[in-house]
Amino acid sequence: MIITPVISSPATVDYPPNPNFGYKSILKKEFLAGRIPLKKDITGHKLNPKYLSVDHTIPKNKGGKSSLYNYSLMDSFVNNKRGEKPIKQFIDLESLVEYIMVMLNVKTMDLDGVDYLKGWLPNLLKAMKEGK
């Protein structure tokens, strides 16, 4: 797909909307606003707003997409340590269950936790099964 910018004035360039843009921001925004009351990420590490990142469940270089359903909130140090290593090496089962239980109860204007889990869990299971 070729993206053609629209030049509305010499100083500005408007690009067509990107349907995937901002999904990382939605998870972060909702967490930082206190609407996702998670204490830990799926690896068992405490979520600190200062060190908050969004992890690709299936890394992009292994076929993962840049979409909400391939993202999870994660401590930035753990995310950097994980890199492209398989997610199952990092998952803490108790924390994963807590992540799911919290997300089941998230319902905001921008994020429906049930809808998120319906898309995210299949990606997580695929990543674990295929060693991604």
Feature map (PLM): residue ranges:
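Histidine-centered nuclease catalytic patch
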Residues: I42-L73, R82-I87
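N-terminal hydrophobic or amphipathic segments with adjacent small-residue motifs
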Residues: K28, L38, T57-I58, F77
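A detector for short metal-coordination/catalytic motifs
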Residues: I26, Y69-S72, S76-K132
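Short, charged surface segments at domain edges that flank catalytic/cofactor-binding sites
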Residues: M1-I42
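Intrinsically disordered, low-complexity segments enriched in small/polar residues
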Residues: N20, L32, I42, N61-K62, ...
